[in-house]
């Protein structure tokens, strides 16, 4: 039986003003509105290229999470923590939140791109479930990463409705 407390794991500062972190905050907010208890856990900001200290800290964090817990991990970290996933895939319910594949980031050199592609492929194939932010990302994960469509949920980002300003 799965633990009722959810863990949401992300690299760096959740209050960083980017679209990805805004999406993460919104997912947490909506899960809480649905009655879920969410424990947020910050990892090193060095992801997706963590050093040994960051990986050791990540291993310690994951080892402290109770067995059978649902752990949602932002893709900026999830795709770059192969060994952590190996150590925990049989005791935790791991959910990857993939905004887009890490190897598709701009500015990567070929060796960085290949490293991320290998690591993220392993990570996604060993996730219990994957949340993506678009139909396009879903299609990429199915076609290029061989992730089963049944393992993927599309949760589109949206905008809040506001009344029109009076003229």
Q: Where do the model's predicted regions map?
A:
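N-terminal subdomain of nucleotide-sugar transferases
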Residues: 1-46, 67
């Amino acid at each position: 039986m799965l633990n009722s407390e959810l863990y949401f794991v992300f690299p760096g500062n959740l209050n960083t003003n980017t679209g990805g972190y805004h999406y993460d905050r919104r997912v947490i907010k909506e899960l809480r509105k649905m009655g879920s208890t969410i424990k947020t856990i910050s990892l090193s900001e060095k992801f997706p290229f963590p050093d040994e200290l960051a990986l050791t800290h990540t291993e310690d964090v994951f080892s402290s999470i109770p067995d059978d817990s649902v752990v949602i991990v932002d893709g900026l970290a999830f795709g770059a923590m192969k060994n952590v996933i190996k150590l925990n895939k049989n005791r935790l319910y791991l959910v990857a939140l993939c905004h887009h594949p890490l190897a598709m980031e701009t500015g990567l050199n070929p060796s960085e791109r290949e490293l991320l592609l290998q690591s993220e492929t392993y990570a996604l194939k060993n996730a219990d479930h994957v949340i993506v932010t678009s139909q396009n990302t879903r299609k990429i994960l199915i076609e290029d990463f061989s992730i089963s469509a049944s393992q993927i949920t599309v949760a589109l980002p949206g905008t809040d409705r506001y009344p029109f300003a009076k003229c």
